[in-house]
Amino acid sequence: DFLVPARLSPGSFYALPQSPQLFKQILMVAGLDRYYQIVRCFRDEDLRADRQQEFTQLDVEMSFVDEEDVLSLVEQMFVDVWADVLGAEVKAPFVRLPYAEAMTRYGSDKPDTRYGMELADLSEAFRRTNFRAFSTALDNGGVIKGFAAPGAASWSRQELDGLVVEAQGRGASGLVWLAFAGDDIRSPVRKHLSDEEVAAIRQASGAGDGDLALLVADQEGRANTVLDGLRRLMAERLELIPTDRWNFLWITEPPLFEWSEEEGKWVSVHHPFTSPATEDVALETATARAYDIVLNGWELGGGSIRIHRPDVQRKVFEALGVAADEAEEKFGFLLTAFRYGVPPHGGIAIGLDRTAMVLAGAENIREVIPFPKTQSGTDLLTGAPAAVDEAQLRDLGIQLRGSTRHQP
């Protein structure tokens, strides 16, 4: 959160809204069955090519709807926008891809499906391998996954070593490659692999003559992250990406919870007000009635059907380790409203800046935002964030600890 000190309440702070999530749910309880707003949001997070700390979204919430109502509404909006702005024909309904399938096939929950190179899981083919790097990964609960890059078998050793460095930069301990050129198989690990294992790689990855197989042996999450990055990189270098294709798709049925290494606990994948697919809220297996809209590898928005039953909301809080008194302190107004009856409701938020970026063909969201922040979160026009006058700090009842002032 970005915190704003309250002058009239010394020691207290406002938080700039990351999202109007709770407010729009309260509106549903109050009987406003349709809510639409273009809203400014603020999130104190690291900046990326598709992310700024201050952004604008089209926010939608509706009562007495299910997933199909929300998805069809948004699909028609994008069909109309693409026709009006680009003169491009986009057909609905969009492809629906379950989260688990997206991770299996692409290693990403926002895949670019304009080109192939889908991932293959070769773990079973190497259960009895003598190749230590693979056997160690499997013994540690990892996986062996990879894909075939068409026509890349002729790459030089220097280029292939560069791919290894790319994989390591994304967190992999290494990268195994095999270049197939007829009966000639070029690879630094060829002598460690049996003919049956090489054949399994060709079959699973779909590698043909002239293709390059790239394999990663690691924990599944890291393997997916590395291979997703390599897949996108190879598509660019091999010029496999059609520039006139708009592959909209929905990612559905994501996990309800995920383990946070940083926080050392289970957290909500979306937010704790997302409805579980069933009343079972088991931490490791529960899925959510949530959906993200993805276009050509960019996530344009996301939403969910919300929890509308107080007992289910309490179960989710308990699963997340939120004590009853803490839930009451933070979300008491929502829980109180729930006691009066809540209509089934759901919604979505569409990132307008990110959508404008894609429509404009820009590679960075800064290109479509006036006065964007730099990678370090600085406004180059005004120099913000900047030091604050001591008198103003006194008026706000704030004393800085140590030399924590920001030097512009």
Which ranges hold each PLM region?
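Class II aminoacyl-tRNA synthetase catalytic cores and aaRS-like
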Residues: 1-408
